[in-house]
Regions:
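Generic structural marker for isolated residues within well-ordered, non-membrane alpha-helices
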Residues: 39, 71, 147
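Charged, glycine-rich intrinsically disordered N-terminal tails and low-complexity linkers that flank
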Residues: 1-65
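Helix-loop elements that line ligand-binding/catalytic pockets
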Residues: 198-218
Length: 218
C-alpha cells in the first residue's frame, strides 16, 4: 500500500530520508550517479561518512527556485493534466520499506484518471560532452533511474519530465525546454532491475558488508 507522510518542516523531512533510498540515490546504487558511486553511498548509509551538503550550491539554489515556475508553465502547456504539488512530504510503499519518493509534482490525466509523476530538471551546458547528455530522445541515465524509482514506489502509470536546458554565450542566455514522456508499461523490466538492485544493496547495508565498486562505462 502506498501512503503519504507529511512533515512540519524541511529539516524534519530531511531527517526522515535517512536510512532509505531516494530517487537520486537509486542511480548511485546502480553505479549511474555521476556525483556519487555505490560504495560512497553505502558508506553514508552505514554511517561511515556524512552526505555532502550541497544546499548552498548555486545550481541547487537555481533549480529549487525555478521548480515552481517550470511546474506552473508545464501546467499551462498541458491542460490535459491536473498538476499538484505537496511540499515537505514523501510517498512510502510497504512493498519497498527501504525506499521513498519525494516528487516535484503529481499528475492526474483528466480524461482517464490515470496518475503520473512530474519531474523537473534544470541543467546548464558547459561543453559538448554535457550537451550530448540531453541530445536525442533519451534523458541522462541517472535521471532515468530516478524516475523509474519513483514509478516503483508510487505505482503510478507514467512520468512527464520537463528539462530546462540553459546555455550562456557572450552574456546571452539561451533556454531550451524539452519534455520526455515515459509509460510504466514500457519500462517494467527496468523497474524490476531497480527493485532487485535496491533490495540487494540494502541487504549489504544491514550486514555492513561493503559492495563491490561499480565502475562507470567508458
Amino acid at each position: 500500500m502506498v501512503t503519504r507522510k507529511k512533515f512540519a518542516s524541511k529539516p524534519e523531512w530531511l531527517l526522515a530520508r535517512k536510512g532509505k533510498i531516494g530517487g537520486s540515490d537509486a542511480a548511485a546504487v546502480l553505479g549511474l550517479n555521476p556525483y556519487k558511486n555505490n560504495v560512497e553511498f553505502w558508506n553514508e548509509m552505514v554511517g561511515i561518512t556524512k552526505p555532502r551538503d550541497i544546499s548552498n550550491e548555486q545550481y541547487v539554489i537555481y533549480g529549487s527556485r525555478a521548480e515552481e515556475h517550470i511546474r506552473a508553465i508545464f501546467a499551462l502547456d498541458h491542460p490535459e493534466y491536473k498538476v499538484e504539488y505537496f511540499g515537505d512530504n514523501m510517498l512510502l510503499n510497504d512493498k519497498y520499506p527501504f525506499a521513498h519518493a519525494s516528487l516535484d509534482g503529481e499528475l492526474t490525466e483528466l480524461e482517464t484518471g490515470r496518475k503520473g509523476i512530474f519531474e523537473c530538471k534544470t541543467s546548464e551546458l558547459f561543453g559538448s560532452m554535457h550537451k550530448e547528455k540531453w541530445d536525442g530522445e533519451h534523458i541522462p541515465d541517472n535521471y532515468y533511474i530516478q524516475v523509474l524509482h519513483y514509478l516503483m514506489v508510487t505505482e503510478y502509470e507514467f512520468v512527464e519530465l520537463r528539462a530546462q536546458i540553459k546555455s550562456v554565450w557572450n552574456k546571452s542566455i539561451r533556454l531550451i525546454t524539452k519534455d520526455y514522456h515515459i509509460e510504466r508499461a514500457d519500462v517494467e523490466e527496468d523497474i524490476e532491475i531497480i527493485k532487485r538492485s535496491e533490495r540487494e544493496f540494502m541487504e549489504l547495508v544491514k550486514k555492513r558488508k561493503k559492495p563491490a565498486l561499480i565502475l562507470p562505462e567508458i
